[in-house]
Design a protein with these regions (language model features):
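Conserved core of the sugar-phosphate nucleotidyltransferase
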Residues: 1-64
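Conserved alpha/beta core of the MobA/IspD/sugar-nucleotide pyrophosphorylase nucleotidyltransferase superfamily
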Residues: 39-116
Length: 116
């Protein structure tokens, strides 16, 4: 659960039952006409893995898509290309991967989640 789901600095995600990303936004999503107390909102933790073909498509656009520009979230360009994005739910705080040594920590978490 996010500490501050209204923060525009934290992209929020909505995922379907197949663990595919439906949408990501800096706005509070999913929205509701009613006030829902204690609603759990999920944030994006980035580990991107795309094949060469998908990356070539991404860079072939040469510029940000309209929705990518509005949200300032690069993963939305893959939406415009029709590329599905799989998600993994983490029940703990996010792990930063800023150095090579951090990769092993992240891989261990992913492996344990895939076994569930």
């Amino acid at each position: 659960k996010l500490q501050n789901p209204k923060s525009l600095n934290l992209p929020k995600v909505v995922v379907n039952s197949k663990k595919e990303l439906i949408y990501i936004s800096r706005s509070l999503i999913p929205g509701s006409k009613k006030i829902i107390k204690d609603k759990a909102y999920f944030k994006q933790v980035c580990i991107y893995a795309f094949n060469k073909k998908e990356l070539k498509k991404f860079y072939s656009l040469k510029m940000k898509s309209e929705i990518e520009s509005m949200e300032d979230i690069e993963i939305l360009r893959f939406f415009d290309l029709g590329i599905k994005i799989k998600m993994v739910k983490l029940n703990s705080n996010s792990v930063a991967v800023d150095e090579i040594a951090d990769v092993k920590k992240a891989e261990k978490i992913i492996r344990s989640k895939n076994k569930q």
